[in-house]
Amino acid sequence: MTDPRRTEQVHPDYADLDTLAPDALIAALADDQLGAVRAVQAAAPQLTAALNAAVPQLERGGRLVYVGAGTSGRLGVLDATELTPTFSWPPERAVPLIAGGERAIRQAVEGAEDDEAAGERDVQAVNIGPDDVLIAVAASGTTPYVLGAARSGRAAGALTVGLANNPGAPLLAAVDCPVLLDTGPEIISGSTRLKAGTAQKIALNTLSSALMVRLGKLYGNLMVDVRATNAKLEDRARRLVQHATGADADAAQAALSECGGSVKTALVMLKLGLGAQEAAQRLEGAGGHARQVLGEGEALGTSAS
């Protein structure tokens, strides 16, 4: 009997996959990944709805809580972890939960994803509340751990977003903002770390990056909230200030040194001729939106979904 979940079905076009020459094998595997991009493009309206719903939550100080199992859980951990160095997002406001706990990041924890009660407990343990945004990810959309977590988060009043790769998946009915990433059968049957996982990664990148844009973490397309924690990023910070202000390298570095390395504060200092303290205070008063401080336009509000 055929599994009704499309991600578990046998792809009809690749029955001879194990007989392909090396170049054809690589081409087939790479080409099939393009379906992930198409799936995310098709889900753009749903991602926009999730974005518009989540921004007010986060503006009130809410957290991003990611939930998943296996590949989906690891992708959530990755997205949560990268928000701090990229956007200076407070690490305590990005909470990744994975079935089986931290050990599951590096190795499979058999049976962990089947424990619905564990998902409920893990969400309750982080004291999820009405200002939080829970992003639940499961290729099948049927994973008990993820369903338990999503239902628990929703019951606690959190905004819930669900990413699943199967039409009609229970996860999509269990959340406030369902996002269907319809990637279909995998080139290696059932291996959802491939196309389904790629679509999840793109969708998470898209949603979290869009959230950071709307929360004032960028100026234009510049990462002005980047945390310079190594030599490469320190050099990038200086170049960002130069690009945004037209200042020379010495002036950019001096401003960064005065304000503790904040690119956003440095560009406001140089553009408005302010000291570090005054620039920082103005940014705080504008909710971190540099354009508003600079008088270059109001911070964008949410658009219609």
From Swiss-Prot:
Give the record's pathway. Answer: Amino-sugar metabolism; N-acetylmuramate degradation
CDD domains under this entry?
Answer: SIS_Etherase (cd05007)
How this chain assembles, per its entry, is: Homodimer.
For this entry, the protein name equals: N-acetylmuramic acid 6-phosphate etherase
The similarity comment for this entry is: Belongs to the GCKR-like family. MurNAc-6-P etherase subfamily.
The further comment given in this record reads:
A lyase-type mechanism (elimination/hydration) is suggested for the cleavage of the lactyl ether bond of MurNAc 6-phosphate, with the formation of an alpha,beta-unsaturated aldehyde intermediate with (E)-stereochemistry, followed by the syn addition of water to give product.
Q: Which reaction does it catalyse?
A: N-acetyl-D-muramate 6-phosphate + H2O = N-acetyl-D-glucosamine 6-phosphate + (R)-lactate
Q: Active site at which residues? A: 82, 113
Supply the gene name: murQ
A Gene Ontology BP annotation from the UniProt entry:
N-acetylmuramic acid catabolic process
Q: What class of enzyme is it?
A: lyase
Instruction: State its role.
Output: Specifically catalyzes the cleavage of the D-lactyl ether substituent of MurNAc 6-phosphate, producing GlcNAc 6-phosphate and D-lactate.
Q: Name one GO molecular function term.
A: carbon-oxygen lyase activity
Query: Which controlled-vocabulary keywords does the entry list?
Result: Carbohydrate metabolism, Lyase
